[in-house]
Design a protein with these regions (language model features):
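PLP-dependent amino-acid enzyme catalytic core
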Residues: 1-302
């Protein structure tokens, strides 16, 4: 039985800023250059799917495969690692372009900056990315996971040297716990991929980190003869990836925008409901959300 796809035109209020400067081409080039400085870096593939294109009756279909990213099977590490670099740059009075991997891991930087403890909440990939980056950069990480998280996910994070636990809390309460502990810890920092009032700078840096993936994809499309895609599809998640992808490509193709489609599951459709209603809110607890151990999915806040 075919399942119907629900869709809505985005009715959220528009801003005067149509290009989202934080995702500007020069800003994202800094993120890309930073990630390229890691010895483990390589571009992930953009795969052409000719049979899918033929089946759908369109000219071309491409998929960006992030399963190869830094050996972590997910794009999330791009955001956490760049946010750490931006934070260290801010604390040391430098531009992030002055802090490639070789400098961040140097004895001189250790003397100048020392160590911070980066706190986060996760149901998997974001926390693993934060733990991986902290481990590589000589920093500390504390990761809280919500009730119902699998031991495999916990072990993957523990292998990266982080302090990690599974709390008897839902995802949102784990975020609150991480933020509280970061505030109470000397040199504690909350690195979360969702934003709230008063906490927007680090999520913006995380979005810029995701821009590396988008920049790669734009270059790979061009190399395969596609100057501009007609449509770009991206999963909603908690909103930061969607905001990053739309923001970057809105700058790259500013004179002729593609159609952007943000996709999410019907059981956790808060962005869809927000777009249809024209205002932000919270989606009710759904079956898919329960499976993913998240009490509710928040609307895009950045």
């Amino acid at each position: 039985m075919d399942q119907k796809i629900l869709w809505a035109v985005n009715k959220m209020p528009k801003t005067d800023d149509k290009n989202l400067p934080i995702m500007g081409l020069e800003e994202i080039k800094k993120a890309r250059t930073f990630h390229e400085s890691f010895p483990q870096y390589s571009e992930t593939p953009l795969t052409k799917l000719p049979h899918m294109a033929s089946y759908l009756g369109v000219k071309e279909v491409y998929v960006k495969d992030e399963s190869y990213r830094f050996g972590l099977n997910a794009f999330k590490v791009l955001g956490g690692s760049f946010a750490m670099a931006r934070y260290i740059a801010k604390e040391t009075g430098k531009d992030v372009s002055e802090l490639p991997y070789s400098v961040l891991t140097s004895e001189q930087l250790r003397k100048e900056f020392g160590q911070a403890t980066f706190f986060t909440a996760t149901d998997g990939n974001h926390g693993r990315g934060v733990a991986w980056a902290a481990n590589r950069l000589g920093q500390k990480a504390v990761v809280h996971m919500p009730k119902g998280t699998t031991q495999t996910r916990l072990q993957n994070i523990a292998k990266e040297g982080a302090q990690v636990d599974i709390q008897e809390l839902n995802y949102d309460d784990c975020v609150r716990l991480a933020a509280k502990e970061a505030d109470e810890t000397p040199r504690g920092v909350i690195v979360q991929d969702t934003a709230w009032d008063g906490y927007e700078e680090i999520p913006a840096w995380i979005m810029q980190g995701y821009g590396t993936m988008a920049m790669e994809a734009g270059e790979q499309l061009k190399a395969q003869g596609c100057e501009r895609p007609t449509h770009i599809f991206v999963q909603a998640g908690v909103g930061s990836l969607a905001g990053a992808v739309v923001g970057y490509f809105s700058n790259l193709y500013a004179d002729n925008l593609p159609t952007f489609v943000v996709v999410e599951a019907e059981a956790a459709a808060c962005l869809y409901k927000g777009a249809a209603a024209g205002e932000s809110g919270a989606a009710p607890f759904g079956a898919l959300a329960a499976m993913m151990t998240m009490d509710e999915y928040k609307d895009l806040r950045n």
